[in-house]
């Protein structure tokens, strides 16, 4: 008796997620060929389409294994299967050309050079030995070279580089790790490096290997070189050369702001900073962010110039993430050269990173002594990402850009197609539809035409790559923000204007997957946010969900002399705080001594008559004021300088002193602020709020200073006082509302000491604490909150 014949079946499988440009089709091909199945795989605008045919058991095995071990850069977010009629085909499984059709897929971020490519780079016997653009399906640029979707070479900035026969063979071989690697190249087919010296430097232009050798020699000689990377230009110099670092700092007008440092390898990084296992993992990850680390007190064999990160216990380190970086820092056998380089964004302070080659020669003229450039265009600017690692091993991203963008975030509620324009500082837009949101790259400040042009370019690029056509715009409520005016010009009708601190809280809620059915206690501390009453907010505790909020507590307002321009003068902020608290400007007080007699007279008149003095409840401004009062920072050369110096001082006394300065916590009726929101059934909403009055803090601080208490102790006691005030108010709120989830958000919570202490006190009190992780707590994460508030309105209307 013969066994029954098993009829073949055919199954159509659609895979969604980050599945293009990552070697997913060769992976599918190997699976199918290993099971002797027939059919095909193809890229489409929706993801990857597979049709597979063969014995039912083998087709089932194929489907089961499909998501078990995908390529390293792949992320599968959805798999759809349906049976279709078998065709009776018997040929081999094939990889078909990409289908051109409307739809959406996910492009991976740019990733660091993989170990296999690094081995080829260093191997004299390999045809890509010292090739500055070596890459494969497991590494290299993606987002910054993509000009459209689906992701194929014609839709990248590699379209102008025809493949040589050898590269074409690799590109077409499913068994090769360069199969359909769109940026694949070699010395024969380009791109090519070039070194362009500044006029009068006495150095001749060079190409290829000579360009790299000349750039290394210039860096070793103390020169500043503009280096074109994947997402823009860096300005580089030898980080151990005090004169070179001082020159770069002076040319860039950077004040005392710390520089990031690129180390040749992990061993070098370990000599400069103390690394935990989690910090080591972040530093060596494919994302290759800048990681903020504790500096070693006595570095082993490598000493950074003092001006790299002056007066800071931390240093931002990153490792090479392109072959150009690896070659600049030197391969074994190369002539001696710097093993640590300052790598700072190629721009003047306050401007966006430069990406265009012609612009680089003009905008960076006077900053760089030479340009190490290449002829592969950059489709979108993408600055380095920045993060710190908490003691528990979790990450707090402070700038979300290269290595993260355009990876989508999963949303807890569906949103209408919406574009949120963020804020004017640390600008990053957010585009969303359905249950996904995409951040654009970090743009920075929108204070000039270059910043606005970069934001518009980022918007066009992200819209093109995601396939989202926004129908709604969301923006900050501040009427003077460039980002708000930009939203009004998008042609999407009147933008939905979202209060600044409500957006911060909504951003954290979305990151943690909260659906908003239960409000949270949102602690939103920053320097500046436009308040409902037209004043400057920033020391806020709100009851909030996505539909609205109620202002529960605030920092006692004080005048902000000169408005936004006064922020650069912490000494004036300090004196305004003393004035608001009824405390005298005593001779010998650091903030008084920092001002001229004329300045003091004008400031006194301003405060008395209320001239150009907008009230502010900004917690960030209080940190600035205290920094001046203890004698640390009176004139800020960059954003948050005063607060950073205060945190650095507090760190040195943190374990030795456990004191805390007490805030006055008083009930306040008519606190003002809020929008209609859905009060949960059975929950009470406080009719009145509280005020956090810093007058007792200031009195205690001045008393301790008169007793010659060390500045670090003063700083530590202030930090603990803020944390205890927050914990006290959150406990009171729980007692009155029954709410138990607290969100910590806003730029002030980038302060590691404050965030850790506040979270610890709240956790001890039995409250659930949500902190930012992949989404920045500062204005770099603002657009996600705007998106959620505006984009979910239709969802809430149907409930």
Which residues are covered by each model-predicted region?
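Intrinsically disordered, low-complexity, mixed-charge
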Residues: 1-183, 187-194
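Internal gly/pro-rich beta-alpha loop/helix module
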Residues: 69, 154, 170, 332-413, ...
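A phosphate-binding glycine/aspartate-rich beta-alpha loop in the early core of alpha/beta enzymes
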Residues: 83, 232-297
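A contiguous, well-structured pocket-lining segment that forms one wall/lid of small-molecule binding clefts
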Residues: 190-191, 424-453, 457-459, 576-615, ...
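Short glycine-rich phosphate-binding loop at a beta-alpha junction
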Residues: 226, 467-479, 737-748
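Conserved phosphate-binding catalytic cores of ATP/NTP-utilizing and phosphoryl-transfer enzymes
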Residues: 270-276, 327, 353-358, 384-385, ...
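Conserved phosphate-binding/catalytic loops in two-lobed NTP-binding clefts
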Residues: 493-504, 740-745, 752, 758-782
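Glycine-rich phosphate-binding/hydrolytic loop that grips phosphoryl groups
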Residues: 501-525, 530-531, 570-579, 770-799
């Amino acid at each position: 008796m013969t066994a029954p014949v098993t009829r073949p079946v055919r199954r159509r499988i659609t895979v969604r997620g980050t599945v293009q440009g990552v070697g997913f089709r060769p992976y599918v091909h190997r699976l199918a060929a290993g099971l002797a199945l027939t059919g095909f795989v193809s890229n489409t605008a929706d993801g990857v389409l597979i049709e597979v045919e063969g014995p039912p058991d083998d087709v089932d095995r194929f489907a089961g294994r499909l998501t078990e071990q995908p390529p390293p850069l792949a992320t599968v977010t959805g798999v759809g299967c349906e049976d279709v009629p078998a065709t009776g085909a018997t040929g081999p499984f094939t990889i078909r050309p990409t289908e051109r059709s409307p739809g959406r897929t996910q492009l991976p971020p740019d990733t660091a050079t993989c170990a296999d490519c690094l081995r080829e780079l260093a191997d004299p016997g390999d045809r890509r030995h010292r090739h500055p653009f070596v890459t494969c399906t497991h590494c290299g640029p993606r987002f910054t070279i993509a000009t459209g979707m689906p992701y194929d070479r014609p839709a990248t900035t590699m379209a102008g580089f025809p493949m040589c026969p050898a590269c074409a063979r690799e590109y077409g071989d499913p068994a090769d790790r360069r199969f359909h690697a769109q940026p694949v190249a070699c010395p024969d087919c380009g791109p090519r490096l070039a070194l362009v010296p500044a006029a009068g430097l006495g150095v001749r232009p060079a190409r290829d290997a000579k360009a790299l050798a000349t750039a290394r020699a210039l860096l070793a000689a103390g020169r500043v070189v503009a280096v074109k990377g994947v997402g823009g230009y860096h300005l580089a110099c030898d980080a151990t050369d005090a004169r070179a670092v001082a020159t770069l700092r002076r040319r860039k007008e950077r004040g005392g702001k710390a520089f990031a440092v690129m180390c040749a390898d992990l061993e070098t990084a370990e000599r400069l900073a103390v690394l935990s296992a989690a910090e080591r993992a972040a530093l060596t990850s494919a994302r290759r962010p800048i990681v903020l680390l504790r500096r070693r007190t006595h570095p082993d064999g490598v000493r950074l110039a003092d001006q790299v990160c002056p007066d800071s216990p931390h240093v931002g380190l990153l490792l090479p993430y392109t072959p150009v970086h690896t070659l600049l820092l030197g391969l074994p056998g190369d002539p001696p050269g710097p093993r640590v380089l300052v790598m700072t964004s190629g721009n003047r302070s306050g401007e966006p990173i430069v990406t265009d080659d012609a612009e680089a020669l003009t905008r960076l003229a006077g900053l760089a002594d030479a340009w190490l450039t290449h002829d592969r265009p950059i489709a979108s600017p993408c600055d380095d990402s920045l993060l710190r690692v908490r003691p528990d091993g979790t990450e707090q991203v402070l700038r979300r850009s290269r290595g993260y963008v355009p990876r989508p975030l999963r949303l807890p509620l569906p949103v209408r197609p919406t574009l949120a324009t963020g804020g004017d500082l640390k600008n990053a837009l957010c585009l969303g539809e359905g249950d996904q949101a995409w951040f654009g790259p970090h743009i920075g400040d929108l204070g000039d035409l270059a910043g606005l042009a970069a934001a518009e370019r980022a918007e066009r690029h992200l819209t093109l790559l995601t396939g989202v056509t926004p129908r709604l715009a969301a923006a900050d409520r501040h009427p003077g923000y460039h980002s708000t005016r930009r939203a009004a010009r998008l042609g999407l009708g009147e933008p939905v204007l979202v209060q600044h601190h409500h957006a911060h809280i909504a951003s954290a809620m979305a990151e943690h997957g909260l659906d908003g059915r239960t409000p949270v206690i949102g602690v939103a501390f920053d320097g500046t946010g436009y308040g409902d009453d037209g004043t400057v907010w920033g020391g806020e505790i709100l009851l909030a969900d996505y539909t609205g909020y109620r202002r529960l507590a605030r920092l006692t307002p004080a005048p902000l002399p000169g408005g936004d321009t006064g922020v650069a003068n912490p000494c004036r902020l300090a004196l305004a705080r003393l004035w608001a608290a009824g405390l005298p400007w005593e001779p010998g007080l650091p903030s008084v001594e920092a001002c001229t007699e004329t300045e003091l007279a004008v400031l006194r008149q301003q405060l008395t008559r209320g001239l150009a003095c907008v009230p502010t409840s900004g917690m960030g401004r209080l940190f600035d004021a205290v920094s001046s009062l203890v004698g640390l920072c009176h004139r800020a050369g960059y954003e948050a300088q005063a607060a950073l110096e205060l945190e650095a001082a507090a760190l040195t006394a943190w374990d030795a002193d456990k004191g805390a300065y007490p805030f006055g916590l008083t009930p306040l009726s008519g606190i003002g602020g809020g929008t209609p929101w859905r009060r949960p059934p059975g929950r009470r909403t406080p009719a009145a709020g509280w005020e956090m009055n810093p007058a007792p803090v200031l009195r205690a601080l001045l008393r301790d200073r008169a007793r010659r208490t060390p500045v670090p102790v003063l700083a530590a006691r202030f930090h603990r006082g803020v944390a205890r005030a927050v914990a006290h108010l959150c406990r009171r709120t729980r007692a009155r509302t029954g709410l138990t989830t607290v969100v910590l958000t806003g730029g002030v919570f980038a302060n590691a000491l404050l965030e850790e202490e506040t979270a610890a006190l709240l956790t001890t009190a039995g409250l659930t604490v949500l902190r930012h992780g992949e989404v920045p707590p500062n204005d770099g994460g603002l657009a996600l909150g705007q998106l959620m508030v505006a984009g979910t309105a239709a969802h809430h209307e149907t409930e």
